[in-house]
């Protein structure tokens, strides 16, 4: 299999602390599930001893997309729904970086849904963490693509009438090569699947249920053991390479299953493009872009 994944080399420093990654104080509402995801991210980087200059956090627009401001590392707060194309460019041009994309259910499945699907089918090497709260919180309680039927909001004062999407079904259909699901209130499990996603050579995506305590409190109590819910792990015998089996798990009624639904290996966009560049350079005797352009002009002169 073609691969172009470069190993991440630690610099000469002996120890990296999560304190070095902390930037501005998070401005989320008290109790927001996004705090937990940020904490997991810091712990994961400290555990892996990855220098902050070797990671990048990119986001679109939304409560979750404030993420890059709170991380002392490369990052970008991009246009609504357009973070994935930017992250794709970073991934293709900087293979030495761990590229993380953060977004909410609106950024991922509404305005940015087309970009998510294409990055997934191309198998771009990056990790997308979807912080799903079932509501547009930044715009003060509007119905999102994952809001359940009957949900009352400023855009649906009598209750949502549109069928919500099933994130797992959509992600499996998109062609993503690593798909997982977790809950921000169970940080140990969330960190476990995020680490697996980070290690995956390809497009990895995780839906993390992240409660909006301001505009949709209790949305995920059914999956929270502390609130009397059931956190149903995917059975150990599940074959993560079986797409049909993954679909069957995705069909479960809410709150559904948690863990790795699907995980396969296939050539990444990064590796295929790098191989194409190598072939082109070999065919053109390593001519520079300017020389190739001049050769093109010469053919028409």
Predicted regions and their residues:
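Short, surface-exposed, charged loop/turn segments at secondary-structure junctions
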Residues: 142-151, 187, 194-203, 217-231, ...
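Thiamine diphosphate
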Residues: 61-137
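Short coil/turn connectors at secondary-structure junctions
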Residues: 24, 51-55, 74, 93-99, ...
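Glycine-rich beta-alpha junction loops
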Residues: 61-63, 133-135, 186, 209-215, ...
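Flexible, low-complexity linker and terminal segments
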Residues: 1-14, 23-24, 212-301
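Active-site diphosphate/adenylate-binding microenvironment
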Residues: 8, 13-79
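Conserved thiamine diphosphate
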Residues: 96, 144-197
